[in-house]
Amino acid sequence: MPREVKKRGRRAAAKRAEEEKEDVDLKVYENDEDYVTFDADGGVAGGHDDEENDGYDNETPYNPLDLKQMPFFGFLDDQESEYFKTAESTLAVDAFGSPEEKLGFISGLLDEARGKELKLVTNQICSKLMERLILLANDEQIRALFEVFSGYFVDLSRHKYSSHCVETLLVRGAAIVEKEVLDPNFDGDSEDSMEKRFLTLANDMKDYIQDLISNPYASHVIRVLLLILGGQTLPSPTSSEGNSSVLRSKKSRTARRNIDIKDSEENDRAYQIPGAFHDALEAIVSGFSKRLKPTAARELAIGQVSSPVVQLLIDSEATTSEQRPLLNTIFADTEDRDSSEEAFVEHLLSDAVGSHFLQNVLQKAPEAFVERLYRLYMSQRVQKLVRRDYAGFVIETCMQRLPEADVHHIIDTAMGEIPYLVENNNLTMVRILLTRAAAANYKATDVANAVLKTFDTDSTDPKLLQKVLQLDEKNPYKPHEASSPGLHRCLVLQQLVEASPEVLATAFVGLNSGDVDVIKMAKHQSYSRLLEKCLRPSINTIERRKFLNKINGQCVDLARDPFASHVMDRLWNFTYKMNNFREKIANELVADEDLKENTYGKAVWRNWSLDKFLRRKSDWWVTLHATDDALAKEYEELGIPLDAKSLANPGQKRFGRGGARIITRGGGTFPRGGGRGRGGFRGGRGGAPRGGFGGSDRGGFKRANGGDGEDASGDRSRKKVRNE
């Protein structure tokens, strides 16, 4: 007879044994009266063989929470499961003929799910359906779901699938609370109010906070609850902008993006809340801090799952209590050095999670607290701390909060460690040092020169860009990983370019050399940002022409790229007073009829005002000149007059009755402001009328290849340009 197909090998055998161990018979309970919890072995939690004992100790409250006990609400039968899976697919496709049809479908689904909600939210596929329904339900349907989940929130929050539904339900509920607060006719004391439901939920959660914040699923629910009770902004669960890390880690946000469920409109905003919410938040924070001893509190503070919630509790404490009991439990409430606190701080400075916790605390703690920690445990050890991978972020935060004298001491001490940091690829600390020195206006040039010296270069070296980036000879433009040394070298160079105009000018010369491919750099996820930093209108005009000639004919391709499209956006300002280049780029972009259909090309089209360029070109020129005027004013406030900075080099100024003029390499002149007629370009000895191209080989520039912008010798840098 046929034999059962089995996987061979010890790993497969071990996996089968594990599955058989977990394969237990679970009784299906059809109503809430039969609901019980099961332990890790599949048995009834607290059950005994003694028939006289019902398995529960009614004298002891359900606290602390046994994390091994997981809720079980039964299974759907095959027919129900198939029906709801099909419904989930229908909602995901969203191919309804009208909004009314969709609303009717949602109402029918909620009616069909009545009595089965707890089974649905704990099912892998059906929980996605319930989350979609929660997002699409009206206010009355949200209230009804709150009522169904009431009494089960603690257990549902700990479940892998239902926890997402609880989070979404809380966000939808917060929007309803705001409506009730803003409605003058609403009775806030009504038992049907969403405010009462939230207060009941907060009271149920209060006694289990210590256990829930250590659960990988419930911790996210607690974060949402704390943000709502505190009236803080609720970040999007998928966005990486703003304070999104308060709600989810980067890994968690990525996982949520992979689920095809759109964010609720209630995300990314704060809500008006009743005063009772502040009282509930204070009760949670004070109750949590009173039950904890310093050792337990510190363990939670460095826990990978619990640490973000403890940070949020400390932030919430600042608005509910002036005494800061939780902060004073984790850290010693004394001015003197404490041995246990010293060991704890040492661990924080050496640990990834701990350093993030300490950084967050120092950002929002009172200045006296920051100065005390720095004075007792860090001031004498700056030289060692800057060498650590994780302590650098803490040092950065200290430099933002400490007095000027302490900041100067850190910079002076850390400068001597720059060679060690570069040699060991700890370039994060190098970037921090560059940033803070510039912000403090203290030895910023000295720090930049020390960094360049470590890379065996200086601000006048034409090979500066190549020496700092250290491009791989075999594959110089391979994608960078998050921890790639190439990425961090690129970030260091960006910081140097930001800090020093001399480094900017020298690095741009490197871009125009034949050693780098600017097209590939523009399409690189890291180097494209470096290009954006370098594309400034203060760059010498001749160097700008060289760069623009390098990308000639590639603009459409760059505009369609997710990274290079940002470079194309920067070209609008980069081409200051180079109107013919702007017009040439615009013509190249509008020649591609499908560019607007591309996601990135559409953004470039909008930023270059190409609709105006096609329909009302005069308006486009007005926009262009307004941009130039704004840029000139902006750079003048920075002490960089763009006309003199960008047009004077490498020639010299000539003053006369006609105003300031620049002598070009070829001997021709043009006015500083640009224009037509008498102020136009003059060619060689004969010149050319009205700003045309000169015909003399010696003094002027020739049109070559039918006016494509190259002279007869093929030198693309010697290109004659006419300002419109």
From Swiss-Prot:
Keywords linked to the UniProt accession: Nucleus, Repeat, Ribosome biogenesis, rRNA processing
Residue spans of biased composition, Polar residues class: 235-247
Biased composition (Gly residues): 665-698
Region named Disordered: 1-23, 39-61, 235-258, 649-724
Positions of Pumilio repeats: 147-183, 204-239, 291-328, 340-375, 376-412, 513-549, 550-587
Record has Cell inner membrane as a keyword: no
Single annotated GO MF: RNA binding
Biased composition (Basic residues): 1-14
Organism lineage: Eukaryota, Fungi, Dikarya, Ascomycota, Saccharomycotina
GO cellular component term of the entry, any: nucleolus
Chain's gene name: NOP9
Keyword rRNA processing: yes
Location (main, coarse): nucleus
Name of the featured protein: Nucleolar protein 9
Source organism per UniProt: Yarrowia lipolytica (strain CLIB 122 / E 150)
